[in-house]
């Protein structure tokens, strides 16, 4: 079951997001996830993307299962980014897809009544089109600020978040892209926030999460 409260602070990560760490990035991801869950993140989205990500499907599945176990232990929703079939196989709580991934209608057909669906939107037009899709639980809006994880994407700014919010789209919104402890407060009135580097690169991860939750 989807509860919009889970969007308050979503941690998004995969092994590639620890590129700055020497050593075993998989263990560092799992350690960081457990610390983040103890620090009260409200959901975790498993995202393996890019050249530094795991490429072997068996390894990806194994790591996803480890992350899922931790989420179950702490009672936080476990969401898989893009990998719809993996999300179904593992019985994840949700799946998050982008505009360039599998067609949203196909995702709905596969996932309806089995797991909740989040959809990325980068324009007001995409958000208006998605508002009639009952099976889509929430919309991810971004990148709000410049971010290394989405170098190829045009920054949409807080303005787009405000436009979607004011347009009458009733679906819960979650902002993503370049969000830090210093700019998160600008976004709270529109919905939740999703972060990668604000946690993965924080020197004091627990403090970063506590600060983000208060924003």
Regions found by a protein language model. Give the residues of each.
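Glycine/threonine-rich flexible loop motifs
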Residues: 149-153
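Glycine-rich beta-strand-to-loop/alpha-helix junction loops that act as flexible
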Residues: 141, 174-179, 195-199
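Short alpha-helical segments enriched in small residues
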Residues: 157-158
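Flexible loop residues that form catalytic
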Residues: 49, 100, 144, 198
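Gly/Pro- and small hydrophobic-enriched strand-loop and loop-to-helix capping segments
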Residues: 94-103
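Conserved N-terminal beta1-alpha1 strand-loop-helix module at the mouth
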Residues: 1-94, 110-136, 163, 170-171, ...
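Short gly/pro/ser/thr-enriched loop/turn and capping motifs at secondary-structure boundaries
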Residues: 146-147, 201
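Non-cysteine beta-strand/loop elements that form the S-adenosyl-L-methionine
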Residues: 97-98, 137-144
């Amino acid at each position: 079951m989807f509860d919009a409260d889970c969007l308050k602070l979503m941690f998004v990560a995969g092994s590639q997001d620890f590129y700055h760490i020497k050593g075993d990035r998989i263990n560092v991801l799992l350690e960081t996830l457990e610390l983040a869950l103890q620090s009260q993140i409200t959901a975790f989205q498993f995202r393996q993307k890019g050249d530094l990500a795991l490429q072997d499907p068996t390894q990806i599945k194994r790591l996803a299962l480890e992350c899922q176990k931790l989420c179950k232990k702490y009672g936080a929703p476990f969401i898989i980014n893009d990998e719809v079939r993996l999300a179904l196989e593992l019985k994840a709580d949700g799946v998050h897809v982008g505009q360039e991934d599998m067609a949203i209608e196909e995702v709905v057909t596969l996932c309806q009544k089995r797991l909740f669906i989040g959809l990325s939107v980068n324009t007001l037009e995409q958000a208006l089109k998605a508002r009639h899709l009952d099976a889509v639980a929430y919309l991810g809006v971004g990148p709000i600020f410049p971010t290394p994880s989405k170098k190829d994407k045009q920054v949409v700014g807080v303005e787009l978040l405000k436009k979607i919010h004011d347009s009458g789209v009733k679906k819960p919104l979650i902002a993503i892209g370049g969000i830090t402890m210093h700019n998160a407060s600008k976004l709270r009135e529109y919905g939740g926030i999703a972060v990668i580097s604000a946690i993965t690169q924080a020197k004091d991860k627990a403090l970063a999460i506590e600060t983000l939750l208060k924003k």
